[in-house]
Structure formats: structure tokens, C-alpha cells
Amino acid sequence: MGRRPCCEKIGLKKGPWSAEEDRILINYISLHGHPNWRALPKLAGLLRCGKSCRLRWINYLRPDIKRGNFTPHEEDTIISLHQLLGNRWSAIAAKLPGRTDNEIKNVWHTHLKKRLHHSQDQNNKEDFVSTTAAEMPTSPQQQSSSSADISAITTLGNNNDISNSNKDSATSSEDVLAIIDESFWSEVVLMDCDISGNEKNEKKIENWEGSLDRNDKGYNHDMEFWFDHLTSSSCIIGEMSDISEF
């Protein structure tokens, strides 16, 4: 099967609908309904194709279609549904009674899409301004006040450091003096101990020498005693030997 010829080749009209054509279509659908859109134009006596009759009825001639501009609630609903469903205009139209998919598509592309982009750009600008303001340096007065506060803090810190260093130097000098004093008196005590120890050693040496002298004297005395004793005994032996000879 090839492609069906267009409406012009078979003698059908295209373009805007006239008021007479709208009246014929409304009367026929009101009496017979629309069970078959392809056969409806011939039965109604219209030189239109079935698709054109269907779109004309659904988008413009239905009695339950809302006329006029979209309300803010409807616009917000379309925006939220478009974020969820995308370009599914029939599904969006099913959530909005009285609004057609073609009408919703037209209002989206002509009005809502631009408004959404504008609000997004505005939000981006506000975010950029807020981040830029947060990153920008403060005013000269604030800078001067902050620098004065910083200088005051640094001055106080330096003064505290100087006082702490003075205290540390004073405590260190006191510690040094205490150490020197302790070392001095310890040296004095050691010297006294050395002197007393030397005196004791000298006394021990003198006593030892005296004992040696006494021992020598006693030894000499004993030697003299035994020498005298031996010599006297030898004399006695000699006298006795002389007596025995007589």
C-alpha cells in the first residue's frame, strides 16, 4: 500500500475553519456522536478530513472546554507536570479538566517556558550575587576596624610575650642564683669535709708512726734482752766446762 493522497488532491479543504463548518460539525456530533472520525466528514457533509474534524472538535468545539487565560494555579500545575512527564501533552491535559493538549502545548511554548527560564536565570543571578558578596572584601571602614582590632590583639600579645619573657628571665636568674648559692655552700661543705678528712688522715698517720716507733723500741728492747740472756748463758756454760776439767 502506498501513501494516501493529500487533502488537496482529493478535493478536501485545508486551513482555517469557517463558522458554517463549525456549526455543521457541532450539530452532527450532538446528534450522532463521533464513533468513526474517518467516516464522519462524508456523513456530515464536510469537505474536511477526519483528522481535521477530530482536532477541531477536541481543541475548540467541545462544550466542556474552558475559555480564557490560564489561572496561576493551572500554570504552576503545568510546570510541575512538565518536570515530571516532559512533553506528554495528552497526559498533562488529563490532569487539567477543560484544557486541551494543544492549548497546553501552546501556552507552554509561548509563555510558561520563557517564564521558567527567566526565573531560573534570576535565581542564578541571585546565587552569583550572594556568592560574590560573600567572597568580596569588606568596606574600608570595616577593614580599618578589623586591622585596628588585629593590631590591638597583636600589641596585647606582644606585651604578654614581653611580660612572660621578663618573668621567665627573672625566674631563670633566681634559679641561677639559687643554683650558684647551693653550689657555693656545697663546695664549702666539701672543703670542710676535705679539711677534716685530711686532718684525720694526718692524725692516723701520726698514730701509725708512733705505733711503729713504739714497736721498734719494744723490738730493740727485746733483742737486747735476748742478746744479754744468750751471752750470759754462754758464759755460764763456759764456766761449767772449766769446772768439769778440774
From Swiss-Prot:
One of its GO terms (biological process) is regulation of flower development. This is Transcription factor MYB13. Plays a regulatory role in meristem function. Functions as component of a regulatory network controlling the establishment and/or development of the shoot system by the regulation of apical meristem function. May play a role in tolerance to boric acid. It is found in: Nucleus. Residues 9-61, 62-116 form the HTH myb-type domain. One of its GO terms (molecular function) is DNA-binding transcription factor activity. Residues 37-61, 89-112 bind DNA. Expressed in roots and flowers. Expressed in shoot apex, axillary buds, at the basis of flowers and branching points of inflorescences. Plants expressing ectopically MYB13 display peculiar hook structure at pedicel branching points, and a reversed order of first flowers and axillary buds. GO terms for cellular component: nucleus. Induction: Induced by abscisic acid (ABA), drought, light and wounding in leaves. Down-regulated by drought and ABA in roots. The gene is MYB13. CDD domains: SANT. Pfam families: Myb_DNA-binding (PF00249). SMART domains: SANT. Keywords: Developmental protein, DNA-binding, Nucleus, Repeat, Transcription, Transcription regulation. InterPro entries: Homeodomain-like_sf (IPR009057), Myb_dom (IPR017930), Myb_TF_plants (IPR015495), SANT/Myb (IPR001005).
